């Protein structure tokens, strides 16, 4: 995946199908966004972000109100405990594309990079008025050993998950963090300490 591919637009049927891309566009450039594009008759697009937050504390209502001022999301996102709530504007079949956030960088034994988040995609039938809870994963804190990147998810109002993408691992003191995976078996990151 190249940085340019994060901005690709896929068009779907004008009548019933819509496309939603929920991603951390910064998997390559560290600019953490969650983009939701609705390609229906009106061609609306919505870009959700982490409202300029990173680390373990999620955004507040004030953070997101400021972030979305002057956009199509202004006044349409409610934040509760760092999770954004949004109401589906039109019924249809949606493709949702989700990216987890990158892990934090590490600097203990050198300069190491956090692993990139996983990418997941799925198709869903959504109804107008349905409430979705959206969490945009936040980049892990960079330190001597970086923190893990946050996962991104979209769930229904009853907490039924629609789609989840795990975050990347934080960089250790002696190596880069591992990327998020899409398999159920997970991934182990381990290194060997070698004194300098």
Please place each PLM-identified region on the residue numbering.
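Feature for long, exposed domains in two main contexts
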Residues: 1-42
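Secretome/extracellular-domain signature
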Residues: 114-196
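A mature extracytoplasmic/lumenal domain signature
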Residues: 5, 36, 98-102, 136-140, ...
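Extracellular and analogous surface-interaction loops
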Residues: 70, 75-78, 83-94, 122-130, ...
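Extracellular beta-rich ligand/substrate-recognition surface
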Residues: 68-80, 107-117
């Amino acid at each position: 995946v190249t940085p340019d591919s994060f901005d690709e637009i896929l068009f779907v049927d004008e009548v019933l199908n819509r496309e939603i891309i929920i991603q951390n566009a910064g998997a390559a450039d560290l600019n953490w966004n969650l983009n939701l594009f609705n390609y229906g008759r009106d061609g609306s697009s919505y870009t959700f972000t982490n409202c300029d937050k990173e680390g373990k504390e999620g955004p507040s209502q004030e953070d997101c109100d400021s972030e979305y001022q002057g956009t199509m999301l202004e006044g349409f996102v409610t934040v509760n405990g760092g999770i954004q709530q949004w109401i589906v504007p039109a019924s249809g079949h949606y493709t949702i594309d989700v990216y987890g956030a990158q892990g934090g960088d590490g600097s203990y034994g050198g300069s190491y990079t956090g692993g990139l988040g996983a990418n997941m995609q799925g198709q869903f039938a959504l109804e107008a008025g349905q409430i979705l809870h959206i969490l945009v994963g936040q980049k892990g804190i960079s330190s001597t050993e970086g923190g893990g990147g946050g996962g991104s998810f979209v769930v229904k109002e009853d907490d039924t998950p629609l789609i989840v993408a795990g975050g990347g691992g934080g960089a250790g003191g002696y190596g880069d963090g591992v990327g998020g995976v899409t398999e159920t078996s997970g991934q182990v990151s381990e290194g060997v300490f070698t004194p300098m």
